C-alpha cells in the first residue's frame, strides 16, 4: 500500500510539473489576469453613450465578460475588448470604439497593447469598424478633429 501511495504521489507531482501547474506563481496567474480584467472593466463601464444619457454598462454595450487580459511578458499585457452595439446598424459604433481606446490609453496603470473589436455578428459593418478602431493613424487623425475630440471628452469624462 505504501508503494502505491508513493507511486501515486510521484505521478501526481510529475503531472503537475509537466503541465506547469507546480511552477511558482502559476496558480496565481489566472487570478491576476482576472483582477486586471476587472480593473479594465471598471474604467470602461462609466463611459457615456454618444447619443443616449446612459453609460455603456447600462446599455450592455460592455460587460465584465467582454474584457480579456493576457500576459505578454512580466510587465506587458494584451487587453482585448469586444463590445456590442445596441443595434446592428449603430452609426456611432466607431465613436464608441474610439472612446474605449482613449479612456484606456489615458487611464490604464500598466503597460499594455490594446485591441478593440465589435462582438462578432453584432454589427453590419463590424470588419470595417474593427480596422478603423485598431489603426493608430486613423485614431490619431480622429482625435485631431475638434468636434470628434469634444464628443469623446464628454463621453469619457468621469461622473461626479
UniProtKB/Swiss-Prot annotation:
Q: Which UniProt keywords apply?
A: Chromosome partition, Cytoplasm, Metal-binding, Zinc
Sequence positions that bind Zn(2+) 2: 89, 123, 150, 153
Q: Does the keyword Phosphoprotein apply?
A: no
| Primary subcellular site in the record, as a coarse category | cytoplasm
Protein localization: Cytoplasm
Molecular function (GO) terms listed?
metal ion binding
Q: Which GO terms describe its cellular component?
A: cytosolic [4Fe-4S] assembly targeting complex
| Residues annotated as binding Zn(2+) 1 | 89, 123, 150, 153
Q: Which InterPro entries match?
A: FSCA_dom_sf (IPR034904), MIP18 (IPR039796), MIP18-like (IPR002744)
Q: Name one GO biological process term.
A: protein maturation
Q: Which domain of life is it from?
A: Eukaryota
Write down the SUPFAM superfamilies for this protein, in alphabetical order: Fe-S cluster assembly (FSCA) domain-like
Q: State the function annotated in the UniProt record.
A: Component of the cytosolic iron-sulfur protein assembly (CIA) complex, a multiprotein complex that mediates the incorporation of iron-sulfur cluster into extramitochondrial Fe/S proteins. As a CIA complex component and in collaboration with CIAO1 specifically matures ACO1 and stabilizes IREB2, connecting cytosolic iron-sulfur protein maturation with cellular iron regulation. May play a role in chromosome segregation through establishment of sister chromatid cohesion. May induce apoptosis in collaboration with APAF1.
What the record says about family reads: Belongs to the MIP18 family.
Quaternary structure note: Monomer and homodimer. Component of the CIA complex. Interacts with CIAO1. Interacts with IREB2. Interacts with APAF1.
Q: What is this protein called?
A: Cytosolic iron-sulfur assembly component 2A
Q: Please tell me the species this chain comes from.
A: Bos taurus (Bovine)
What gene is this protein a product of? CIAO2A
